[in-house]
Amino acid sequence: MNQRDTLWILTAVLNATNCSMQLEHSSSFILRPNNQVVVFPFIFRGCNIAVLPTAKHSDLRRNPKRMEDSEPLFCNISHIIWSFTIGGVAYKDDDRFKRLFSERMEGYLKDISSNTSKVYMKGNKTFSEFLEAVYKRIFQCDGKRGGHVMRYGEDVMKEIGGMMENAPPELSEEEKRQHQRLWGNIKKYTEYLYNIERLKHLIEVEKMVCDACKEICLGLREEELMGLLAEGRMRKSLKMKLGDEEAGKKGYLEYAIVNDEILLDAHREYGGEVTKELVMQMLLGKKGEEIDKRYINKVANMIKERQRRREREIEKRVKKLLRDEEKAKGRKDGKKKSVNVSEVKEEESETEEVEAGEEAEMPSMEIGGARRKTGKKSRGGRKRYKIHKRVSRWRKSPEKIKEEWDRESEERWRGRSLEEIKEQKVFHDIAGVLELLRSEDADKFFIDTGEYTKGGSSRGRLVAIGVLESGEKKMLGVVEVGTFKDSPSGCPVVYHLMFRVTGIEEIGSVMSPEFAEANDIEKIDEDKEYQDMGKFVYPKGTEYEIVRREQSFQIVWGNPFDTSEVLCRLTIQCRPCVI
């Protein structure tokens, strides 16, 4: 890193509690030439989401906790954006730049924060629209000499010129030449920062990112959005710099460093779908600096293939509808048309051919980023697990479950009423999930949150996003799988399995391996009272069906006396693809 980079540092704001630049905590990063900082229109607190791009202020008012996380940020939003995008000159034993900022920019930014926040709080704008408005107000370039920021930039360059001309007299001739070179480089970098085209690009790129984030949130189903946020929870740049403790105290914005020229060119050439996918990949953890023309072409080709597959699927459905209409019309006319075997075979082969073609043309990609191997492989590539008695117990009748829990030492379940056991059976009697867990596709659905130690044993935790439908209730949440290693075989034993109802706002905390509610079992009973999962069967009279789709895994429990009646349905969502 050279001296120029050392002096030009952007301060990313975390714990902004007032409208001044005096912050309790901050983090610094280098902004190099040809790069811009884009800010995502999400407010985070720790790993959790506090405000979505689509959130209006009226939505926040209904949730006091979200208001508490976001209000300090609103009142200081302009200073935060300034710190992300421009920053300032730091020079030891000389506060001239700090004084210049206080005189020329402090009030300007304070007014913008106040005015834009009032409009957002009283109006009908979304948070992404609010962020766009802040950028436009700060970096407006339509006035004389390019606006207030450009004029301030000219003043900064004058001060730098003064530093170049007035080198400290005690310096030697060689040190004076170094002083001149240093401040000459700083002047060039300042000219770049306050270039009118760069400021226009700042506004344009931020609008592009805000629009894409809003479309992502509106276009995804709730469980898909939760999967996106779950996948990206550990891949936050600012949070990583500050650590969990600091990032958990106040609301903060996340950022990416990108080449604005490349992003703008991609948007003009390929349109909004490719831009949206690029932004989604950054939310999943793709580094903005890694997005080059080659990567953009790869994403564009993937989007084209996705659209072709969608068109083929629509065409296939239309053909089926037309065939169904013809059959219905034939029955109505009283003409019984028998479909000969060759026609049926032709229809089947057509479907198989389309599906095979789709499979062959799927671009190579990873599911959810780098995949960790979970479980011990058995023959045929399937993973081997054992089931602890505290998990297999839930397959029994509520009466039997209560009887067994009352005999156990685990305080959490002992003494529960029969009604409570019946309610909890819906969330815990999901052993059909283990079929997916031991399959080769497990990593496409489950996120390995990492290992941790509790009660003297090493434990692991797998989490998948899902939707549980029981009766008239439809619940969004996660499927949790807690494991420990069997000794001496090393085979994972599933000691915890349940569906946990979870909202989007809490998904970050729930994804943590040390999530308190999931791991409140201090000591695991390792008395060998568990069975090999390959031998697991549901008791007689229980009917359930597994439905495998490209983007989901579904377990359907039916009434054994009436197969048309669905008692419960659990759908596990596939992890988003990292390109």
UniProtKB/Swiss-Prot annotation:
InterPro entries: DUF3654 (IPR022115), UPF0329 (IPR011667). Residues 325-360, 370-389 are annotated as: Disordered. It comes from the Eukaryota. Residues 345-360 have a biased composition (Acidic residues). Pfam families: DUF1609, DUF3654. Residues 329-338 have a biased composition (Basic residues). This is UPF0329 protein ECU06_1620. Belongs to the UPF0329 family.
